[in-house]
Amino acid sequence: PYEANVLTGEAKGENYPEGQRITALMVNNLVDARPQRGLSKAQMLFEIKVEGGITRFMPVFNDYHDIDEIGPIRSGRDQFFQLILPWQALYIHEGQSVVMQQYALDYDYGLLNNNDGASGYRDYNRVNWRGLSYGNGLALEHTMYTSGENIEKYITNKNVDMNRTYNSTFFNFVDYRQDNPVRDLTQSQDSQLTTKDGPVVKDGEYVEISHSQSYKTRFLYDNTCLLYTSPSPRDGLLS
């Protein structure tokens, strides 16, 4: 039978959290917020543009217990919420736009919309890539973190229903039971995009994501998709 991981399309492993609701978090991606923590352990990672031309990350996990520490946690936005709404994910962030707040009310999302980083904590001693820390040039918004332990406390204390059965995968993945379940991306539009660091799509499998100038380190991510939509600015967005 087809027993695929809801987030990756791969075969479910022996430790797959069957019947557990997926968990999504909002992570800051401003330059001063880097380096982030915990992103590499996510089963799925979204990067979407928000107001002002900046982007934010939304890592999504099959099992919140796998989160050692993640952050900096940032405020929620409706474009991310709309992605996870059909899956009724636990959505963790710190603060939210008025549009996001209205979406949560309209869809009666209740305790699944967590607005304090799941009792998140401040790491005032963190040092960013420029050597800045809180009280030494780093803004407070870059210091909020949470963990699987914190999330579990929130779920337990608030009696959040984490039971959810998924009958399909997040995307229409190629069936992992095929002999070669890898789509060839080399002829896609994105493969024609190049930078001084090389092609965006490499070997039909990996996409290079570039945020700033090259520092002789290249980051390659597997199972990556690019989705283009027409943005529409909204009034009333909060930081």
Name these PLM-found stretches.
Residues 2-46, 51-230, 234, 239:
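A surface/extracellular/periplasmic glyco- and lipid-processing/surface-interacting theme
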